[in-house]
Amino acid sequence: MIRDEIPISAQVLQWRCVESRVDSARLHYSRFAISPFRSGQASTVGIAMRRALLGEVEGTCITCAEFKRVTHEYSTILGIQESVHDVLINLGEIVLRSDSYETQKAFISILGPKKVTAQDIILPPSVKIIDTTQYIATVTKAIHLDIELKIEKDFGYRIEDPIKSADGNFPVDAVFMPIRNVNYSVHSFENGNETQEILFLEIWTNGSVTPKEALYEASRSLINLFIPFLHAEKKEFIYGLKNTYESNMSYFSSPSLSADIDEMTKGVTFKHIFIDQLELPARAYNCLKRVNAHTISDLLNYSQDDLMKIKNFGKKSVEQVLEALQKRFSINLPKNKLHFH
């Protein structure tokens, strides 16, 4: 018998912050307690949360620097104490916070002699420097130092190939991970005749996000990963899964799957799956957000022609959306508007 509803556990988890402190501008710490778990559950959640915190929380970094009249990363600039390579390393360590997913530009334009710090960076309104005292370079002579910076938001890290540098543009190795460390511990306690567990989660950040914000973002990332499994109780989907492995693979690769999923999406199948799962480039993602297309269900209200009408949403962005929908959900958006009744 197939259940039409997923049973909800009577177990009610509660969490609270038991300790929080700011050790420095670039080191924030909080300790959270979550309970009660049944025996064995706390460790499962702890492992998943640690991985999500370290790998799924986004950060903002300087990813490229343009120097005028400089041809090589290991060049020296007359009147600058550091080599270009050393300046790039210092720029990569600057901690930023941004509310925008668009690629941003920032500038350094100073007259020496002067000690150059993060405070000297001219930023767009959506970007904030966490520690303005971070060191960049020392200008020892009365010369101008002009650097144009590219700022991006992403997750993980990006190690650039120095060969890609050209015309004074030098990539910066970017670490987009605002979480410096995560620890968890599990403690058992007796509740009547039942053994339950409490999970303690310790989070250290670089100050660009608070530990509480990081906990929220990591939790949302995990929820998004598991939402597709919640819809496996759909009868038309479950019946298909009763076939052999080979039949399943044939079914999933066939055009009929698109029609099946289109039927499912007429209801609430994708109502709670956010477009974050499509992993779209920043331009396409932000354009969809601006028109309040927050979920896959919202996006399915658009045809290809509708997407083309969105401001700054070009043909390339449409192709990126179509490719992501097909790859992740085997969905094809119609060319023209379809009306569901």
Swiss-Prot record:
Q: Which reaction does it catalyse?
A: RNA(n) + a ribonucleoside 5'-triphosphate = RNA(n+1) + diphosphate
Q: Which UniProt keywords apply?
A: Chloroplast, DNA-directed RNA polymerase, Nucleotidyltransferase, Plastid, Transcription, Transferase
Keyword Hydrolase assigned to the entry: answer is no
GO terms for cellular component: chloroplast; DNA-directed RNA polymerase complex; mitochondrion
> What biological process terms from GO does the record include?
DNA-templated transcription
What are the boundaries of the region Alpha C-terminal domain (alpha-CTD)? 265-341
Q: What class of enzyme is it?
A: transferase
Alphabetical list of Pfam families matching this protein: RNA_pol_A_bac, RNA_pol_A_CTD, RNA_pol_L
Task: Give the start-end ranges of region Alpha N-terminal domain (alpha-NTD).
Answer: 1-233
What superkingdom heads the lineage?
A: Eukaryota
Main location per UniProt? Answer: plastid
Question: Example GO molecular function term?
Answer: protein dimerization activity
Where in the cell?
Plastid, Chloroplast
- SUPFAM superfamilies named in the record: C-terminal domain of RNA polymerase alpha subunit, Insert subdomain of RNA polymerase alpha subunit, RBP11-like subunits of RNA polymerase
Under Enzyme Commission nomenclature, its number is 2.7.7.6
Q: Which family does it belong to?
A: Belongs to the RNA polymerase alpha chain family.
Domains: what does the record tell us? The N-terminal domain is essential for RNAP assembly and basal transcription, whereas the C-terminal domain is involved in interaction with transcriptional regulators and with upstream promoter elements.
Tell me the NCBIfam families matching this sequence. Answer: rpoA
Quaternary structure and interacting proteins, as annotated: In plastids the minimal PEP RNA polymerase catalytic core is composed of four subunits: alpha, beta, beta', and beta''. When a (nuclear-encoded) sigma factor is associated with the core the holoenzyme is formed, which can initiate transcription.
Q: What does this protein do?
A: DNA-dependent RNA polymerase catalyzes the transcription of DNA into RNA using the four ribonucleoside triphosphates as substrates.
What name has this protein been given in UniProt?
DNA-directed RNA polymerase subunit alpha
Organism per entry: Takakia lepidozioides
The organism's lineage is: Eukaryota, Viridiplantae, Streptophyta, Embryophyta, Bryophyta
